[in-house]
Regions:
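Register position in tetratricopeptide repeats
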Residues: 62, 96-97, 130-131, 157-165
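Helix-start (N-cap) detector for alpha-helical repeat units in TPR-like alpha-solenoids
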Residues: 50-51, 84-85, 118-119, 152-153
């Protein structure tokens, strides 16, 4: 009997990395509830997997579950304070929950990590717009477009503010 248990434990250990790899793959490649379940499984197996926290947070944002997304982005940041995508995502989730000031702090941190990131300038432009800081919003939307001319969110932002790109 003990030999059977030993063999079973060894087989379980051999299969564990493959199961984790499958969960991570689905977490990254799938969307919606399937991705959320896969990310949750990946995190059950490896609670320090920042990629799975960020991916699950993104899926929560897509579903409008901003409190859950903020919690996951925050955990990713706690584990790796250099994760640009976690600061960007959390900034957007804060904006969507009416916490633009907190979002602004995350956008500022993201720009410290990557000073010429079009996506972050676009996001900060939206945050400034929500805060009523029109001139700052215009400047950031223009900066985003200078870095990435196809940044539609910045074009739309300028149009809402009555400014040409």
């Amino acid at each position: 009997m003990s030999r059977f248990v030993t063999v079973w434990v060894v087989l379980l250990a051999i299969g564990a990395p493959a199961a984790l790899a499958d969960a991570r793959k689905d977490c990254f490649e799938k969307s919606g509830d399937i991705a959320i379940r896969a990310c949750t499984e990946a995190l059950r197996r490896d609670p320090r997997d920042t990629v799975s926290y960020v991916n699950r947070a993104f899926e929560y944002v897509q579903k409008g579950q901003h409190a859950q997304s903020i919690a996951d982005y925050s955990k990713a940041i706690e584990l790796d304070a250099g994760r640009l995508d976690a600061y960007q995502g959390r900034a957007w989730a804060y904006l969507k929950t009416g916490k633009a000031e907190q979002g602004l702090a995350d956008a500022e941190r993201a720009l410290q990590l990557k000073p010429n990131d079009a996506r972050t300038f676009d996001m900060r432009g939206h945050i400034y717009e929500a805060l009523g800081r029109r001139d700052d919003a215009v400047a950031d939307f223009r900066r985003a477009l200078a870095l990435e001319p196809r940044m539609q969110g910045s074009r739309d932002g300028l149009q809402r503010l009555g400014v040409k790109p």
